[in-house]
A protein has these predicted regions:
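C-terminal catalytic/substrate-binding lobe primarily of soluble NAD(P)-dependent oxidoreductases
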Residues: 1-190
Length: 190
């Protein structure tokens, strides 16, 4: 579809009534969604667009938090592997292998809202939740269920070969596994 580039700044989002900022995973997630759409013969139409952002909140506080987050994200992205800047960053950031404690992983969670807009102005809203830390607990469960799905559930996706995405390789079989075994929920709100 006629997608624009990923969000590069802070802006106000009328649909959410809040300030939004770039989301670090958007650079990967958006490409996976768009490739899935293309592999499925543009099932949502050639005008389908997809992007992601992270809410930084409402009002002036949300705007300030958005710009602070943007600066922090930019600072992380600037650290080339062998640069002095990266060496300085490594003094304050977690080392490889470090991360949240077991208690933090177990008590972590995520939730996000997805808004779909149709040409006629109709909106559809969905909520996705996970019962563990998204960077560790939920991701490991998603990977495990993906492996089990590929090994045990046969060809459930819409595509059989090539460079596939999770949805085109595993389809609803993966969605069902994530809901049944990985602590995720996918709910249409309106």
């Amino acid at each position: 579809g006629p997608d624009k580039g990923d969000l590069q700044s802070v802006k106000y989002d009328n649909d959410f009534g809040a300030w939004i900022m770039p989301f670090i995973m958007a650079a990967i997630n958006t490409r996976v969604v768009r490739r899935s759409h293309a592999l499925n013969d543009y099932v949502y139409g050639k005008d389908f667009r997809y992007d992601e952002a992270m809410s930084s909140g409402q009002g002036i506080t949300g705007r300030i938090k958005g710009y602070a987050g943007l600066v922090a994200l930019g600072a992380l992205m600037l650290g080339k592997p062998d640069s002095l800047y990266r060496k300085l960053l490594s003094k304050v950031l977690p080392s490889p292998g470090e991360g949240p404690s077991a208690e933090e992983r177990e008590s972590g969670y995520f939730n996000f809202t997805v808004i779909g807009k149709f040409k006629n102005g109709k909106l559809i809203t969905a909520k996705v939740t996970g019962d563990r830390d998204p960077g560790y607990g939920s991701t490991s469960k998603m990977l495990g269920e993906s492996a089990a799905c590929l090994a045990l559930d046969g060809k459930k996706g819409t595509q059989k070969s090539g460079v596939l995405t999770p949805s085109t390789a595993m389809g609803d079989a993966l969605l069902n596994r994530l809901e049944e075994n990985a602590g995720l929920s996918f709910t249409i709100l309106s």
